[in-house]
């Protein structure tokens, strides 16, 4: 199987829609592909946060938590793009990430 470029995976994530039955496995597979085959960098953040904006109430049956855990496992400084995303459209998981980030920052001082 040919490894796809990061921008191809991100494009598919950006265009993802769950099935009418509420099947999110396609996004789960795309996130797995992104985390396992590419070096996630700052350029990925807007696309990943747009998923939160498109589905602000997280009806993903836990799939979008993969974005939270994936980003939090990197050493990326994601606070600014997260705040920009929340300014465009508040989302449940975006708010959770911001709260966790602020809590971690406060405890690290």
Predicted regions: what is each one?
Residues 8-19, 30-33:
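Solvent-exposed, amphipathic alpha-helical segments
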Residues 17, 52-56, 71, 86, ...:
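Alpha-solenoid helical repeat architecture
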Residues 43, 62, 77, 92-93:
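Structural detector for tandem alpha-solenoid helical repeats, activating at a conserved register
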Residues 2-13, 40-53, 76-86, 107-109:
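Amphipathic alpha-helical scaffolding segments comprising HEAT/armadillo-like alpha-solenoid repeats
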Residues 14-15, 78, 89-108:
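Alpha-helical interaction scaffolds
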Residues 18-29, 44, 53-57:
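HEAT-repeat alpha-solenoid elements in large eukaryotic scaffold proteins
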Residues 25-39, 62-73, 95-107:
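Structural detector for internal amphipathic alpha-helices that build alpha-solenoid repeat scaffolds
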